[in-house]
């Protein structure tokens, strides 16, 4: 066989070529997405390692900041799967019961009699007279010229004279296929026959025919298919059933490759051509039962008369082994089988990539929330700590100043109430370290002095306890209301800025100062050095008791000593001493606290500057880039599973795209298709983030479902790229509905539906930012759903851009600083239209000749006018919703029950009250 032109292809080969070609086109996109994902992760690691290296942060703080992005990477098992799958080459692996079956199937695949069959092939694989078939492994590859060569797998080509190279041939000579018995060269015996053909299918996939089992075990023969290849495993059956050895070999193949097998029942070449159909009908059930019984087939369904499977696989389902029983219509089962095997690998890779993108993107968004909260709450915490400590200090100083007179009276009162008990306790006091006789004989002066001190100590200790308890109760409420909150706030500030050990010592010292300053009552209870020092001054105030002769130690003497000691105490001096020490401690602790707080604030200022810089990078660069990769991987998965949607008639046009009818896609019917052509990277990124927010939302009956997306690289003849967003199709939009006329009950129900949808978005942390008539769609029952989440973003991801439709835009939108109350404002304007029952512009807006004039008027307070038909409660709700002060707008949790009560009152309670509103529509 010679020639330079491409060989003719059979219908089967052409269909397989198209399947392989489609696989390669999608592989290019998968490779690109994977490469860009790797580059993105690599850049993230480099950026944050450089940031931490150049920062003045300590190692602990740097590692903390870096750890926020440590999970922005491939898990090892996912990376290995993608490396082996993305870009893996399709490889047709031809197995069979014997060489004749394998060769017959190969000829069918290529559409020509390339390998010898029948008498040309020589003796069978298990021939008589003890002969054994020794046919080589065959590898078919693409080349401009047809040639045969012997080569060691993965090594080098052998210099060997082949019969095919000696002249013209149409069928590969049998001598080149076999290993001769007299051949003793091990390299020659192990070599495989490489057949290069200029065949279209071989441009897309290699083909391998396994050798006879006597030449090489099956597990060694298919080893090449385990590395960076997607094997399309075909098994040719030309006998009534499989032998036990063949079943065992098939199980080895399934264990090694983990891919499904397409069993192909071949007609027997020796049979009369008029009988095969009848013979197949008799044999196929036997073969099918055997394959099912051995677990080599899982689905008992066979083929219909056209040769196709009676049951088509579900999109995305794992491919299963199949049996093709009608050889003439083999393409009906082999082509879908091939497509499903190839598609399954790409769907798994795209799904894994998209899962990684979504996980990392959610991490970015969550961290944006955390960083935004940190930027907002840390300055407030510092200010709160400073204010509360100041209030506590002022309150305690006020107590110290005003309590002196109260404390004097308290001490006098305490002494008065305790005097008799103190005198009794003193009379019964048992002295320590002094031996007193029973009759109270006089002792030495030194012992007398010790006895007097012990009596004084008794009085001081009892008085200490009583006065301390009274003082504690007077400031106890301050400890509960100030110190606990201060400590919790301080603890959160410390945890948000974990730095070096020096900072830890400073923080711990700050806590100790707080405890020492404001938990004064602890020192009263404990017998600490502070207590001894504090009450030593009280003992000094007691006048010394003078005596000339040592007295007798009797209960009366003890009572007299105690009496003199109590009378010698000065309540005024005691009160003054207590308050003075209290003030001194307060001042020193207050100054130390203020100094430590200033130090902590300085450290937080530097950290917050870095956090704000990181927050900006996450919002403006990291998240949008990753969202685009996520959109691409998800769109690739969707097009692999469901194909490219067919565009129907145009339904409408908007600022950013065209909406078409789409009859059926991905099992959804009917659908609407929004075609968007992003003009630049910014619009690409915005669209990608919109898609991510919408796709990750749980399904909700008040939001239009987004079914999927497809990126069309052939849009406008390939001159631009369009993103096709496939979504639920509804009956009409609210603008059209109001023009056609809606009853009051329907309009109020629409208002309730819209509020329910907005509340759901807000609960998910999203702002819609473009609530208007055109973005509310109605079904056939006139129930509303919100659509077009093009401006929908989490609050933490907003950059302050001015977006929306001018009439529905809240005044603060023009400043770039706003929150979810902008949706409440927009609902107020929408509710005006619903109550009016028409689409006519309010007078205040109709007079404006330009957007700028409209914006200026809105900022100055221009709002829609009250129409005569408006109910008072409806008008009050509108006014509250479009209040110029965002903080004064009602929460949607209040708006919803208000609307429900209006609906009951106006639609169910009194037909007379609602008649004016009905007339307005």
From Swiss-Prot:
SUPFAM superfamilies listed in its UniProt record: Protein kinase-like (PK-like)
Localisation: Cytoplasm; Cell membrane; Apical cell membrane; Basolateral cell membrane
Main localization of the protein described in the UniProt heading: cytoplasm
EC nos: 2.7.12.1
GO molecular function: ATP binding; protein serine kinase activity; protein serine/threonine kinase activity; protein serine/threonine/tyrosine kinase activity; protein tyrosine kinase activity
Residues annotated as catalytic: 770
Start and end residues of each Protein kinase domain: 645-899
Alphabetical keyword list: ATP-binding, Cell junction, Cell membrane, Cytoplasm, Developmental protein, Kinase, Membrane, Nucleotide-binding, Serine/threonine-protein kinase, Transferase, Tyrosine-protein kinase
Keyword check for ATP-binding: yes
Binding-site residues, ATP: 651-659, 674
Catalysed reactions, semicolon-separated: L-seryl-[protein] + ATP = O-phospho-L-seryl-[protein] + ADP + H(+); L-threonyl-[protein] + ATP = O-phospho-L-threonyl-[protein] + ADP + H(+); L-tyrosyl-[protein] + ATP = O-phospho-L-tyrosyl-[protein] + ADP + H(+)
Tagged with keyword Cytoplasm: yes
A GO BP annotation: embryonic organ development
A GO cellular component entry from the record: apical plasma membrane
Enzyme class: transferase
Stated role: May act as a positive regulator of ERK phosphorylation downstream of fibroblast growth factor-receptor activation. May induce both caspase-dependent apoptosis and caspase-independent cell death. May play a role in the embryonic development.
Family statement: Belongs to the protein kinase superfamily. Ser/Thr protein kinase family.
Protein name per its UniProtKB record: Dual serine/threonine and tyrosine protein kinase
Name of encoding gene: dstyk
């Amino acid at each position: 066989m010679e020639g330079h032109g491409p060989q003719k292809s059979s219908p089967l080969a052409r269909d397989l070529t198209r399947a392989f070609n489609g696989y390669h086109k999608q592989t290019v996109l998968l490779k690109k997405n994977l490469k860009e994902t790797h580059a993105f992760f690599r850049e993230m690691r480099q950026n944050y390692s450089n940031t931490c290296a150049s920062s003045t942060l300590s190692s602990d703080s740097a590692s903390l900041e870096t750890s926020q992005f440590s999970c922005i990477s491939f898990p090892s098992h996912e990376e290995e799967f993608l490396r082996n799958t993305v870009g893996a080459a399709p490889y047709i692996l031809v197995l069979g019961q014997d060489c004749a079956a394998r060769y017959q199937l190969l000829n069918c695949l290529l559409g020509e009699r390339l390998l010898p069959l029948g008498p040309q092939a020589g003796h069978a694989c298990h021939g008589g007279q003890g002969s054994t078939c020794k046919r080589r492994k065959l590898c078919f590859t693409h080349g401009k010229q047809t040639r045969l060569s012997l080569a060691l797998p993965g090594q080098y080509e052998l210099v060997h004279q082949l019969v095919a190279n000696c002249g013209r041939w149409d069928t590969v000579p049998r001598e080149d296929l076999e290993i001769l018995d007299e051949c003793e060269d091990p390299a020659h015996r192990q070599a495989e026959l490489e057949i290069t053909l200029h065949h279209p299918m071989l441009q897309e996939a290699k083909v391998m025919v396994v050798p006879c089992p006597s030449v090489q075990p099956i597990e060694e023969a298919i080893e090449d298919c385990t590395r960076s290849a997607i094997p399309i495993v075909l098994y040719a059956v030309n006998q009534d059933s499989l032998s036990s050895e063949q079943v065992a070999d098939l199980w080895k193949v399934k264990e090694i490759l983990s891919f499904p097998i397409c069993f192909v029942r071949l007609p027997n070449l020796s049979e009369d051509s008029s009988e095969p159909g009848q013979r197949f009908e008799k044999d196929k059930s036997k073969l099918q039962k055997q394959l099912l019984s051995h677990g080599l087939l899982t689905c008992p369904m066979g083929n219909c008369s056209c040769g196709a499977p009676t049951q088509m696989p579900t999109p995305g389902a794992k491919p299963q082994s199949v049996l093709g029983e009608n050889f003439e219509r083999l393409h009906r089962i082999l082509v879908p089988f091939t497509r499903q095997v190839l598609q399954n690998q790409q769907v798994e890779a795209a799904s894994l990539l998209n899962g990684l993108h979504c996980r990392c993107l959610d991490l970015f968004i969550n961290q944006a929330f955390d960083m935004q909260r940190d930027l907002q709450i840390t300055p407030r915490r510092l200010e709160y700590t400073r204010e509360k400590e100041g209030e506590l200090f002022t309150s305690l100083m006020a107590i110290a100043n005003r309590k002196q007179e109260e404390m004097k009276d308290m001490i006098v009162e305490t002494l008065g109430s305790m005097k008799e008990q103190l005198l009794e306790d003193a009379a019964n006091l048992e002295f320590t370290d002094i031996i007193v006789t029973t009759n109270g004989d006089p002792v030495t002066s030194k012992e007398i002095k010790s006895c007097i001190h012990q009596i004084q100590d008794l009085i001081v200790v009892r008085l200490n306890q009583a006065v301390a308890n009274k003082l504690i109760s007077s400031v106890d409420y301050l400890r509960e209301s100030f110190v606990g909150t201060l400590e919790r706030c301080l603890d959160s500030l410390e945890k948000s800025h974990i730095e070096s050990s020096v900072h830890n010592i400073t923080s711990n010292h700050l806590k100790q100062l707080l405890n020492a300053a404001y938990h004064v009552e602890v020192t009263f209870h404990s017998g600490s050095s502070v207590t001894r020092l504090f009450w030593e001054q009280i003992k000094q105030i007691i006048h010394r008791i003078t005596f000339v002769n040592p007295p007798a130690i009797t209960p009366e003497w003890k009572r007299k000593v105690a009496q003199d000691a109590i009378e010698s105490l000065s309540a005024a001096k005691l009160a003054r001493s207590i308050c003075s020490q209290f003030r001194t401690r307060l001042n020193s602790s207050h100054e130390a606290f203020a100094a430590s707080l200033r130090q902590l604030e300085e450290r937080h200022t530097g950290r917050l500057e870095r956090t704000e810089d990181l927050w900006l990078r996450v919002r403006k660069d990291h998240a949008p880039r990753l969202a685009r990769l996520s959109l691409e991987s998800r769109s690739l998965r969707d097009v692999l599973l469901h194909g490219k949607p067919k565009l129907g008639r145009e339904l409408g046009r908007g600022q950013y795209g065209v909406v078409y009818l789409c009859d059926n896609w991905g099992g959804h019917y009917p659908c609407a298709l929004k075609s968007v052509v992003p003009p630049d990277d910014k619009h690409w990124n915005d669209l990608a983030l919109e898609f991510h927010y919408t796709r990750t939302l749980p399904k909700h009956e008040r939001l239009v479902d987004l079914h999927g997306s497809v990126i069309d690289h052939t849009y406008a003849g390939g001159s631009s790229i369009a993103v096709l967003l496939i979504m639920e199709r509804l009956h009409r939009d609210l603008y059209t509905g109001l023009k056609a006329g809606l009853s009051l009950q329907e309009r109020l129900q629409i208002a309730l539906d819209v509020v329910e949808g907005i509340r759901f978005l807000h609960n998910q942390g999203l702002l819609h930012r473009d609530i208007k008539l055109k973005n509310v769609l109605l079904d056939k029952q006139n129930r509303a759903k919100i659509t077009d989440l093009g401006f929908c973003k989490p609050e933490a991801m907003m950059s302050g851009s001015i977006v929306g439709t001018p009439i529905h835009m809240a005044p603060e939108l023009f400043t770039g600083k706003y929150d979810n109350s902008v949706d409440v404002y927009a609902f107020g304007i929408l509710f005006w239209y619903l109550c009016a029952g028409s689409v006519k512009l309010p007078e205040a807006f109709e007079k404006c000749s330009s957007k700028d004039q409209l914006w200026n008027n809105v900022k100055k307070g221009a709002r829609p006018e009250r129409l005569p038909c408006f109910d008072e409660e409806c008008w009050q709700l509108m006014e509250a919703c479009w209040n110029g002060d965002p903080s004064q707008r009602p929460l949607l949790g209040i708006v919803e029950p208000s609307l429900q009560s209006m609906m009951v009152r106006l639609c169910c309670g009194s037909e007379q009250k609602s008649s004016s509103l009905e007339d307005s529509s």
